[in-house]
């Protein structure tokens, strides 16, 4: 059982191999995947969200590992898609598969899974960006108190190819 990725790699997403995980596939897929399961009034991609998270980590002066992990934190969605949080919470097997894939991505590009403190920073940034996405697009405040966000992400629809290239360029800068 396999999927065929953008770069024509055939991989089993239930048992990912390091050599099958390619940044080009993640960048391409995320540039085409919408946030909020398509319920925002305009298209805002997972790729744009990931770039915004990485830029926020840079603005907070976090380590290059945390910045790269922020860029990659939704990488599993390139291979598995995503499920909304309320539903995902009920799907323990999916969460296990997603964690396995995400851990494989971290190992592939970071050399290891982020430490607990690093994961805490990644999660904080992810949730802050999510909060401001929903505030901007839906007028909905997901938390009682607005979380810290140092940057000011541009919430706009961008050409897919531009997002893909920006993702790849940022990755290249972070892995020099």
Set out the residue ranges of the language-model regions.
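Metal-dependent phosphohydrolase cores
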Residues: 1-176
């Amino acid at each position: 059982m396999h999927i065929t990725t953008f770069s024509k790699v055939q991989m089993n997403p239930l048992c990912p191999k390091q050599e099958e995980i390619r940044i080009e596939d993640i960048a391409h897929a995320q540039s085409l995947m919408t946030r909020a399961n398509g319920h925002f009034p305009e298209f805002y991609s997972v790729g744009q969200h990931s770039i915004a998270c990485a830029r926020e980590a840079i603005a907070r002066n976090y380590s290059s590992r945390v910045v790269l992990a922020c860029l990659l934190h939704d990488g599993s969605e390139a291979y598995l898609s995503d499920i909304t949080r309320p539903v995902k919470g009920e799907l323990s097997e999916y969460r296990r598969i997603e964690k396995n894939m995400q851990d494989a991505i971290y190992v592939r590009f970071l050399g290891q899974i982020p430490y607990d403190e690093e994961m805490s920073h990644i999660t904080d940034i992810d949730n802050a960006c999510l909060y401001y996405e929903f505030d901007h697009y839906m007028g909905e405040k997901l938390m009682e108190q607005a979380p810290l966000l140092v940057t000011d992400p541009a919430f706009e629809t961008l050409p897919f190819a531009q997002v893909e290239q920006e993702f790849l360029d940022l990755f290249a800068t972070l892995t020099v």
